[in-house]
């Protein structure tokens, strides 16, 4: 009812005019707030409910909190409050809770979610299984991710992408690429997220040529258009392999907006390989994209210092002071003069 309203205001006005609101009405308004990224408003409404909330109420709030940068612990706390109230979680509850678990690496709770799902015979739910694969993978529990994945009766693109990304993220790049090959053999159509995992695997394994090949196949074989994240991964793969000018060429020819990720990958590799000219280009670009990020200034200063260009290194420090940019706690310039 409320979800079909063009604006939240008419829905809220209608909500306020209803003299006796049942839980369905409360849930509809709370859900509209959370789906509109107005979680604080949803929480305020939740706190003034004059009737007992039900599972759907908690599901909306937990899902909304889990999407906030600082909301994971709050979402988990609300889940336990829901359990204390005697309410029985359903699949939607567990799906809402998993992102919060990932946000704070709550591995024990992820295991509890899986156990609960098995006890209540909902562990075969494909979306929940894929979510568990991702959650275990993101937390570095690859054995559990592997077990859940191969225990699925049917594996969709989300499940395949999750297991590929899990291996790529935790240093199992070649396993990630082998999983992609199995995905192709299973005739599952990969998407953009799948290829992000594949490209990251290539990057971490130093397989720049394979990264170029997979990047090309995205569009030619599967019709997946490359996003800025895909280009950044390709730049990272080339940069890590020491092919800095090829990486720079990719940046120059990108048909999408160049992000700080791409320039940052190039700048980091410039320090590794002692490439000053490209470092200056990347540093200048980053100062325009992220003028308040101290890491970029510090990294470029270190590159200058490593090349014996101490005046330029000091200039970077002065530039930071002029712009009011403060170095992150614990970071050091480490600029030595001979």
Give, region by region, the residue ranges found by the protein language model.
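Terminal (and in a subset, N-terminal) low-complexity or junction segments at the ends
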Residues: 1-338
């Amino acid at each position: 009812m409320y979800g079909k309203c063009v604006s939240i205001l008419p829905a809220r006005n209608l909500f306020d005019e209803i003299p006796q609101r049942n839980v369905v009405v409360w849930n509809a308004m709370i859900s509209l707030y959370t789906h509109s990224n107005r979680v604080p408003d949803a929480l305020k409404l939740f706190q003034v409910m004059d009737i007992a909330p039900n599972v759907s109420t908690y599901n909306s709030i937990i899902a909304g909190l889990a999407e906030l940068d600082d909301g994971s612990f709050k979402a988990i706390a609300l889940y336990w409050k829901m359990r204390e109230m005697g309410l029985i979680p359903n699949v939607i509850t567990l799906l809402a809770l998993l992102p919060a678990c990932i946000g704070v690496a709550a591995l024990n709770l992820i295991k509890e979610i899986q156990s609960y799902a098995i006890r209540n015979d909902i562990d075969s739910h494909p979306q929940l299984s894929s979510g568990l694969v991702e959650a275990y993978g993101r937390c570095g529990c690859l054995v559990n991710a592997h077990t859940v994945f191969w225990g699925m009766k049917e594996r969709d693109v989300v499940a395949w992408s999750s297991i590929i990304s899990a291996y790529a993220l935790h240093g199992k790049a070649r396993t990630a690429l082998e999983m992609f090959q199995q995905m192709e053999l299973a005739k599952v159509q990969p998407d953009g997220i799948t290829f992000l995992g594949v490209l990251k695997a290539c990057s971490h394994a130093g397989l720049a040529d394979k990264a170029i090949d997979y990047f090309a196949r995205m569009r030619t074989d599967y019709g997946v258009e490359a996003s800025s994240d895909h280009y950044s991964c390709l730049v990272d793969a080339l940069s890590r392999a020491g092919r800095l000018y090829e990486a720079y060429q990719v940046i120059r020819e990108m048909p999408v907006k160049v992000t700080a990720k791409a320039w940052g990958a190039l700048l980091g590799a410039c320090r590794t390989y002692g490439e000053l000219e490209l470092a200056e280009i990347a540093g200048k670009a980053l100062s325009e994209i992220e003028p308040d990020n101290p890491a970029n200034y510090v990294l470029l200063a270190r590159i200058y210092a490593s090349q014996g260009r101490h005046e330029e290194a000091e200039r970077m420090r002065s530039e930071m002071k002029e712009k009011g940019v403060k170095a992150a706690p614990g970071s050091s310039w480490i600029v030595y003069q001979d």
